[in-house]
């Protein structure tokens, strides 16, 4: 097979030429090609305060941290697999693709179609492509990655057909693949088609990403010597944490780890009346990854945030509930009541526009569990609407 058919290309090469013409006309280069250009600061640093009296505490012998070396682009090798199953393959006419899947903190999508154009010598081919962050309008990111496409074989005597390429994906090069991946007549047979279904996979190995930050990930089930100094035991399962970090968020943990409680001298503490996976979710919310609050976890995070007096968790839950349309108003009012969430209660009351809205709340089973203060607030809202 000629080199023409084995070299990866953009799905729409005209897009790249148009982009280059615009950049050439403006006499600028893509910022992601030279990430080391550091702009001047817009604002001055805070005024220098008077120097404190120098105290010799041995710090003079400490070597400064080499930020320049640390800030060199670091490799963040991440792998992922995308799988595209194409039904009714013999009648494939238009482009089909997978949902987006995040690999290396960037969205990737595998796509396939047929092509019979000048670049395929007017021969019908099965084409496959990979999209990386195609919906972003930013020109500040780039991603070095290796992509391997595989056409799954249905015949045990025939290995999968594969092709691989390496590319720097960026705004100007976010779609790449093989327009001549395999001749149509070579694909459309029993070696690769079963029950009118063809399966294509793409293995993506991300080697380096610029302009997009990786979200920190933590495995609380693994002991990390430098940052873990406390073991929490829940239902005989161990979670390894940093007690000072937890104490910053929770006065309950501060008292447990640093006051005159018997746990102070321990390196392992058992927590009772806690569900392991729910507490693990709590840790993911308060650790630097700051996992978002969702409809699935908000209820038990409110319980745990209240139990351990973690104001950050309570605030995040309240912020989520104020903006959520998936949680019923009566449920929001009940939680606002239970955990004294004034902003949430205020939001619920402001969303009541008609007397019928209050009547609907009153007809619910949960209404009887509301406090007298909340019932009075609902009555006052009715009076405001009527008057």
From Swiss-Prot:
Organism per entry: Caenorhabditis elegans
Domain BTB: residue ranges: 228-295
Protein name: BTB and MATH domain-containing protein 38
Biological classification of the source: Eukaryota, Metazoa, Ecdysozoa, Nematoda, Chromadorea
Superkingdom assignment: Eukaryota
Disulfide-bond pairs as recorded: none
PANTHER family: BTB AND MATH DOMAIN-CONTAINING PROTEIN 36-RELATED
MATH domain segment(s): 79-204
